[in-house]
Amino acid sequence: MGFEDDPYRDVDGEPIVDFDDFGNDREPSTEPLQDFDEDLADDIGDWDGEGSQTPVYDNDKVAKPRKRLVKKSSSERVTIDVPELIDEDVDDAEFDEFMGGRGGGSTDYDDKVGRKRKKEKERSSSGSGKEKRHKFPNRGERKSEEIDEMWKSIAHNPENDEEGVRTMDDDNFIDDTGLDPSERYGGDAGDRSPTHYPQAEEGEDEDEVNNLFKMGKKKKKTERNPAEIALLVENVMAELEVTAEEDAELNRQGKPAINKLKKLSLLTDVLGKKQLQTEFLDHGVLTLLKNWLEPLPDGSLPNINIRAAILRVLTDFPIDLDQYDRREQLKKSGLGKVIMFLSKSDEETNSNRRLAKDLVDKWSRPIFNKSTRFEDMRNLDEDRVPYRRPPVKKPSNKATMESRDGDFDLEIRERKTGLTSGQSSRGDRQMTMRPEATPLDFLIRPQSKIDPDEIIARAKQVSQDQRRVKMNKKLQQLKGTKKKRLQATKVSVEGRGMIKYL
């Protein structure tokens, strides 16, 4: 038999690969893991070398093998920390005893391990320029290094309690130079804690806190007594009255009256304050407003801004006309006449005219005891005296009387001839009478047949009936959808009428 064609055997027929060296996947391997660890250590040591262990050859067989170029850095070479896999502190003798106890005699694996250990010893003993092989630290050394690092981090922590170097700021913090030693803070008199001076420490903190809280608060307004308020109101009213008189004088001189326009902001601000409105009413502010609103001496109205501002102020002004004093004050001031004039003036704007009409309605009803209820208005109509037209006087016909006096002789002549005046007038003249309107003055008012309560009840009933009709329609629709007529249909053999089922 020839083994030339078998790729897994050599020329002598021996197998190229010994399958006994490989373990079964299903069975646990009995070989130790030290071989893998040693190979890994060798590989790491080889990486620390200068060149690569795998030379690159050119296609030319004559050329020498060239090594890969490795760029050397100026900094120190960094060693790689590989996690601990085996404990190298175990002596070679113990390892040999362990291996001998397992298998007995020497094996190929033992030879390999021995050769590798010799190489390691040679590398460590050689004094060449190559760096020594990195030795993996054991567990004890690693723990000690971690503890040292921990203590170093604690020592360099800025939050530690160690006392640092004293600076000038520390000296100036509590400056007790020039004081009696017994009064110094923490001096020779004994240890003193900050609680020994509670007033000084707490006082400063409280001041800072109070200042922070006071920043957002408004200052409390000082309350004035009634005498001061009355004096302030009198001064303001005097100033405003002088302003109105100055504008009237400027208008007589033909100059522009702008003083009231300048003081308008003061007027609106002062009269807009609720706490001062009652005081202004007591001092007769309605007369002042009448002087500001009335036409100027040349008949022109004041500025439109003045009129609009005063009308808005009067709308919100608390004039209680239920009180007798307030009603009399409003009547004597003459302000109502000016407001009535503005409500009917064609020169006034629509908005101001509307405000004036609202004021007239609001003030006139309490003064004239008018009611806004419809029933009261009906009673007023019934109590009112009906209007009667004066009797029409027939004009006396003086011309006919004169003609009759002049025709006296003619009448005598007619009598002689046997004709009366009536016959002659009828035959000779055609008279027409002007129709006169009969006076339609009714004395008895017809009774109203409209009952408002009945109308309201009828409207409610109609609305309820409409709702009921809508609900009945909806119920009928719901009932109609449920009840579907099921009728048997005749199926045609020819397929007629089947389109409806598709």
Curated annotation (Swiss-Prot):
Pfam families: Med26. Residues 13-22, 34-49, 87-97 have a biased composition (Acidic residues). Residues 287-370 form the TFIIS N-terminal domain. Disruption phenotype: Semi-dwarf phenotype. Stunted growth characterized by reduced leaf petiole lengths and small leaves. Altered responses to brassinosteroid (BR). Residues 1-61, 87-208, 385-434 are annotated as: Disordered. Residues 1-12, 138-151, 181-194, 401-417 have a biased composition (Basic and acidic residues). Keywords: Brassinosteroid signaling pathway, Nucleus, Phosphoprotein, Transcription, Transcription regulation. It comes from the Eukaryota. Interacts with BZR2/BES1 and SPT6 (via N-terminus). Interacts with ASHH2/SDG8. PANTHER family: PROTEIN IWS1 HOMOLOG 1 (PTHR47350:SF4). Belongs to the IWS1 family. This is Protein IWS1 homolog 1. It comes from Arabidopsis thaliana (Mouse-ear cress). The gene is IWS1.
